[in-house]
Amino acid sequence: MKGVDDAFLGVGDKPGLDIWCIMGSNLIAIEKSLHGKFYTGNTYIILSTVELKSGVRQHNVHYWVGEEAKEEDCLTASDKAIELDVALGSNTVQYRETQGEESDKFLSYFKPCIIPIQGSLSSHMRIYGDKSKDTTMFRCEGEHVARVTEVPFSRSSLDHKAVFVVDTESKIFLFSGCNSSMQTRAKALDVVKHLKENRHCGRCEIATIEDGKLVGDSDAGDFWNLFGGYAPIPRDVQDTVMTELMTTSSKKLFWINKRNLVPVETNLLEREMLNSDRNYILDCGTEVFLWMGMTTLVSERRTSVTALEDYVRCEGRQSNARSVILTEGHETVEFKMHFQHWPKNAVPKLYEAGREKVAAIFKHQGYDVTEIPEDKPRHFISCNGSLKVWLVDNGSVTLLCTEEQEQLYNGDCYIIRYSYIEDGKDYHLFFAWSGLNSINEDRVAAASLMSGMIDSVKGHAVVAQVFEGREPEMFFLVFKSLIIFKGGRSMAYKNFVSQRSDANGWYQKNGVALFRVQGLKHDCIRAIQVDLAASSLNSSHCYILQAGGSFFTWLGSLSSPSDHNLLDRMMDKLCPLKQSLLVREGSEPDRFWEALGGRSEYSKEKQVKDWPADPHLYTCHFEQGLFKAKEVFSFSQDDLVTEEILILDCVEELHIWVGHQSGVLSMEQALDIGKMFLQAGIHQDGRRPIDTTMYIVTEGDEPRFFTSFFNWDYSKQTMLGNSFERKLAILKGISQKLETPERSLRKSSSSSLPRRSPGTSSSEPTTPEQRAAARTFASASTGKLLRERSPAALSPSLSTPSPSPRSRSSASSSPASWNSTPSTVARRLFPPSLHASAEAVATGTPRRL
């Protein structure tokens, strides 16, 4: 390929990493056994290739710059990154990674950590300047990725907010600053394990030291003797430069004209401001983006990259501003969030296109292929469980009989409990289902009553909030067949309808009604009553038309033979003693159209199935009155830490995982967190409906349909203690002697958060500023509820460092207790004022149904 280095030819075809080291103007491929070993005197290019479930390959290009790298190598790396982008069809996202300031995405490729090696790598693979020391000291930060920096072996390198690892000849010490989080301490243990296995061949002692703990601890004495004895650690100093960058709300947009930056004057950023024949720089403080139009030349892109580096250098922000390079059509979520409106991408439906190509190949080879079987859905629950359905009515519930539990009304709300046995354990899956026309009073009651019903069962319970029209496949699997009628039976809904004198469309046994029939093959079938009009038809589906005592079964021209079989089965359910008239699309009799109120236009395009979405994991927490979410890249089971609440985002549904020590005490609190997450708009296509399905999974109760997203180790599921204690027990090979934590969601049947209608929000972000800043966002209503830290805790008169908002342990406010062990306090997601009321509810007698 012209203008592309030969080293890039044929790369990116397989998932994984490809790494090259810059040697002058040449690229030296790094073998896989050496991946993760970076030298401070070199610059590297890293290609990450991931195959999405849609079959599309996603490419991310990073060029890593060591702190001692040559300037000419940095320029070569940026040019080669452009060449690699061209070789891959100009659909990559490029990141400039500076040693010590790497992105979480980059660090996630090299778990447990990367520890840059002093010196450089020559073209003959000889190491220069590799310094071997008897004792080395590392500073560790980060909760889901470890940021490891070698620091001088000195007492002055210690502080209260980080975790430090001191590696000696015979023992590895881990020192936890009193303001470090429990997650950071646990992640630092991964670094300790890495050093033990790679530098000591697995043979060395491990000692953990707590900041301020001296009395009766021989390991602490040995640790401080390394520094010549104990001395107080100075108070932490806040990084004012980074704070200013993070708090600034101003954004600057420039278009690049022959390496000159021309400001674009605007108050709000809109997608229409970006022209395809230009390149732009968007400065957002902590991140600086280069957006390249799809019609720009390669030479223009190289000039723009140079302009970007000049801009960051002139601003003096090489070390604290991350550069991201994008091509039009391949923008990241972080970039889109800075714009007021960003249109939804028109993505080719490769999933269905591939199926059609396979069918064409078989037909060409002489096979009679009328239909390629669809992929059978993956079922992770037993289909032999027991089902119970309750109607929510006037603040209470009524158990439906077996004959009625497969008939729901769209004006009502229901609680569904599906109980089944899995791996010898009892599981209970609760759904709070809200009909499309149900009223807010019943919706709120359904969520509250379901929360109280959890206490009535033994075993593992998972709850879900589901809305009509957005049900997951899991919901329909628990029903053998399901019919959803128009109308309602609850008193609140009937009163609402009577006040409006609007009962048109309610299902009448001998009336006229139209049902759309769908189903999961061989598993379940459903019929949903739709508006009685020809416009409700769709060529991709089959329908049952009830016209008094007569029935029509209508076959859409794009429906499949399996759809026709489902239609016959539903006729036996809906009207078992009636004969129906089979009608194919295009040959309808006049009385068919008369029953529908006349002919009209309807959708005749094939409904294309979206490919399965790739899941993304986010950690959520409150910080200084703000609710924030941050993506966890290359996630695993170990990222489900007990002190946190995490959201597994599968686009069509959310799985809200609640750790025992997260501080979330009720189902309603967890649901509110899910609503805030949906309102933030961090998904690729922006904000999603508030009625997206949300599962609440409590630590220890994980069902198989959740664990299937992980390489699950069930022995870890039963471990006790905080995340640091659990990982330390594994590392030392000792058995735990800890009490079983109380499962808070089983104890609370109400929430102290204000309840909202599922279709409304008390505070929805509408500006880019509210949606931006590294996937962090705020909820104004929740911010008012959060109580800020006491000014006394931040008093400058105190010599001990004050706990950070993310601290799990705090130093005493008394100078006399400087040398005492700081008490470990689990960070609570919600502030104490909210917990007090939630705990008061938890101590009351649970509602029995």
Swiss-Prot record:
GO MF: actin filament binding
Protein name: Villin-1
Keyword Electron transport: no
Gelsolin-like repeats by residue range: 30-107, 147-213, 262-335, 405-475, 527-566
A GO CC term attached to the entry: actin filament bundle
Feature: compositional bias, Low complexity: 747-782, 791-823
Family listed: Belongs to the villin/gelsolin family.
Higher taxonomy: Eukaryota, Viridiplantae, Streptophyta, Embryophyta, Tracheophyta
One Pfam assignment: Gelsolin
Location within or outside the cell: Cytoplasm, Cytoskeleton
Protein's organism: Oryza sativa subsp. indica (Rice)
Span list, region Disordered: 739-849
Protein role: Ca(2+)-independent actin-binding protein. Binds actin microfilaments (MFs). Involved in actin filament bundling, severing and capping. Caps the barbed end of actin filaments and protects them from disassembly. Promotes VLN3-mediated MF severing.
Keywords, ordered alphabetically: Actin capping, Actin-binding, Calcium, Cytoplasm, Cytoskeleton, Repeat
GO BP: any one term: actin filament severing
